[in-house]
Amino acid sequence: MHIPAGFYPDWLLMLGNIIAIPAVLLAIWRTETRFWSGWSEGLQVAAIFMALSALYMLQADIKPGMAVHWLGVMLTVMMVGPWTAILVLSAIHVFLLLSQGIGDVSTLGFNIATSVLLPVVIASAIHLFFYHKFPRIVPIYFAKVGFGDLMCMWAVDAVLTLCLLTWSGYPSFHIYQDFTLILALMGGMEAVISTWVVAGLVCYFPIWLVTFNDEEYINGK
């Protein structure tokens, strides 16, 4: 979601910057260098960047300067891992701000904290939970991606709704009508689409999924 300038108090936006900047720097340090040095891996990152940039521009405007968009976090984490996902998704926010004027410089850190960092943490936790607690079979892998995308979208919905209710003075009825319902519906659609995409990747490009291993999920080893 893109928050307009002046919608939240300055201290909350500053808190977003305090959280986002160290997290992005840590992601730069921890990300796997093969995603930047290898031709195939670089192509994969570029494809994710272009696809999500296009999807983010297909946003639903709620009020002037305020819009919601697809997240694609769970699928991105499954493809490149959490640290690279943070870099790619944060870069998309910066790219859209500079090239399309989507968002605002003062709210960039808050947007990254809520629309990138929080969903990536949730996606990683869901992946680890399913990996260790459920059988490692392909249908479970598909279900994990769909469930994770839905939970990521709803988590962002819950946090931003709480902030809106607490600090913005935005009427609660309009929050439900214009914001919460839209994100809930988008979460469901994103879960279905992500499940289809990951099914195609498992069948044709499993090498693009760093969290998928043929020996574990197909051969049962």
Predicted regions and their residues:
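Loop-to-helix transition at the N-terminal end of transmembrane alpha-helices
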Residues: 36-53, 72-75
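Hydrophobic alpha-helical transmembrane segments
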Residues: 42-50, 86-90, 109, 113, ...
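Membrane-interface helix termini and inter-helical loops of multi-pass transporters
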Residues: 1-6, 63-66, 70, 100-104, ...
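Short helix-perturbing small/polar motifs within transmembrane alpha-helices
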Residues: 22-27, 97-98, 105, 111-157
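Alpha-helical transmembrane spans of integral membrane proteins, capturing the lipid-embedded, hydrophobic core
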Residues: 18, 45, 49, 53, ...
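Alpha-helical membrane segments and adjacent membrane-interface helices in multi-pass membrane proteins
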Residues: 55, 59-119
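Alpha-helical transmembrane segments and their cytosolic interface
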Residues: 1-11, 16-42, 171-221
